[in-house]
Swiss-Prot record:
This is Fluoride-specific ion channel FluC. Keywords: Cell inner membrane, Cell membrane, Ion channel, Ion transport, Membrane, Metal-binding, Sodium, Transmembrane, Transmembrane helix, Transport. Its main location: membrane. InterPro entries: FluC.
Length: 132
């Protein structure tokens, strides 16, 4: 079993708290703008988080050589709490339970494809603007 430093644990905790608050704010604002007919809030935070992880990984590895504590804060803590697979799964299940099969399938397809595209876009952006 690999050990970790207490500072990593603290970094994950603080990052997680901030990420959870950011997710709450962003997803609620998205629902206020676009309504709750579809899982818009979850789709937006997961897409933003996917873009951010691609960009941040390039920046931390190629540009800034970030410490393990900073990586733990941003990737595991902040983005781990900001994005949410469990909410995506529950919303999809709820669509299925209410017979909204099209919405369920759309949620799965759009979420996965948007997430993959956002990661690619984040990596591409990082390499275009920040790599040597």
């Amino acid at each position: 079993m690999q050990s970790f430093h207490v500072l990593q644990l603290i970094a994950v905790g603080f990052g997680g708290a901030l990420g959870a608050m950011a997710r709450f704010i962003v997803s609620n604002q998205v629902y206020a703008w676009w309504g709750r007919d579809f899982a818009w809030g979850t789709l937006v935070v997961n897409s933003l988080g996917s873009f951010a992880i691609g960009l941040i990984m390039i920046l931390m590895i190629d540009k800034f050589h970030a410490s393990v504590e900073m990586r733990s804060f941003l990737i595991v803590g902040f983005l781990g709490a900001f994005t949410t697979f469990s909410t995506f799964s529950f919303e999809t299940y709820s669509f299925l339970q209410t017979g909204e099969i099209t919405k369920a399938m759309l949620n799965i397809g759009v979420s996965v494809l948007t997430g993959l595209f956002a990661v690619w876009l984040g990596i591409w952006t990082g390499k275009q603007f920040f790599s040597p």
